[in-house]
A protein has these predicted regions:
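Non-catalytic cap/lid and distal C-terminal segments of serine-dependent acyl enzymes
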Residues: 1-136
């Protein structure tokens, strides 16, 4: 996995990660917000090597969204920070090319193909190879 963004926000840390998914056979991204209590801290009195356990909320965006829509537009971080909630926002679908260099199927309709945001496993060609979003 590779961290591609990191931003301090309401005392916590908003990160975006990219990884190769064995489920979609593509590079996928997800955002994660770690509230202050989830982050390890060092003070003069103590050194915490791990943060505290926090509840986790998985946000699944809708049609035409990416992992960026929710984290940029919702204003969630203040609440998540105050209530010690880790928020995970995955991308909505595979995009671009797969790990073999083949194009991921797409469609000209906004509600089918890349960015469609259906969290189900496709069962028919050409979608079944990459669109396994329930499992992802």
């Amino acid at each position: 996995m590779k961290k591609i963004e990191s931003h301090k926000l309401h005392g916590g840390d908003l990160q975006v990660w990219q990884h190769t998914s064995a489920t979609t056979h593509t590079e996928m991204k997800f955002a994660i917000y770690l509230p202050p209590k989830a982050i390890a801290h060092e003070t003069a009195e103590t050194t915490e090597t791990t943060g505290q356990r926090c509840a986790v909320l998985y946000w699944l965006s809708g049609l035409t969204c990416t992992e960026q829509n929710f984290i940029q537009k919702s204003g969630f971080a203040e609440y998540a920070s105050r209530h010690n909630v880790i928020v995970v926002a995955p991308d909505t679908s595979p995009r671009g090319v797969d790990i073999s260099g083949n194009d991921v199927p797409d469609d000209s309709a906004y509600d089918l193909g890349q960015g469609a945001g259906f969290y189900v496993n496709a069962t028919q060609a050409p979608w079944a190879t990459h669109f396994q979003m329930y499992d992802y």
